[in-house]
Amino acid sequence: MPSISININLAFAAALLGMLMFRSHMMSSLLCLEGMMLSMFTLSTLTILNMQFTMSFTMPILLLVFAACEAAIGLALLVMVSNNYGLDYIQNLNLLQC
């Protein structure tokens, strides 16, 4: 395995570890989720270019589209929660209330 792939896998693992450690704040969780998506995009792009899969060149672009949608929805939820509650603590939210 080349050193670039090892570094990208380590970046994914670090973002996953950050997601598990800093799950009490919504902003930290969103940043770690974006780091995971960025490392997945880079790894999938490198894999497709190295293996020369001509039929799956659109897969990294599709992954970026889903990452952008996830970021937009996450930021909208963050703004809504911070406007309503004044905090981004996930423990203070009761998601069962309407």
UniProtKB/Swiss-Prot annotation:
Q: Which GO terms describe its cellular component?
A: mitochondrial inner membrane; respiratory chain complex I
Question: Which GO biological process categories is it annotated with?
Answer: ATP synthesis coupled electron transport
**Chain segments annotated as transmembrane:** 2-22, 29-49, 61-81
Q: Which reaction does it catalyse?
A: a ubiquinone + NADH + 5 H(+)(in) = a ubiquinol + NAD(+) + 4 H(+)(out)
Q: Where is the protein found, in the record's own terms?
A: Mitochondrion inner membrane
Q: Tell me the disulfide pairings in this chain.
A: none
Tagged with keyword Protease:
no
- Could you give a GO molecular-function term held by this entry? NADH dehydrogenase (ubiquinone) activity
What the protein does comes down to:
Core subunit of the mitochondrial membrane respiratory chain NADH dehydrogenase (Complex I) which catalyzes electron transfer from NADH through the respiratory chain, using ubiquinone as an electron acceptor. Part of the enzyme membrane arm which is embedded in the lipid bilayer and involved in proton translocation.
Q: What is this protein called?
A: NADH-ubiquinone oxidoreductase chain 4L
| The organism of origin for this protein | Microcebus mittermeieri
Q: Which gene encodes it?
A: MT-ND4L
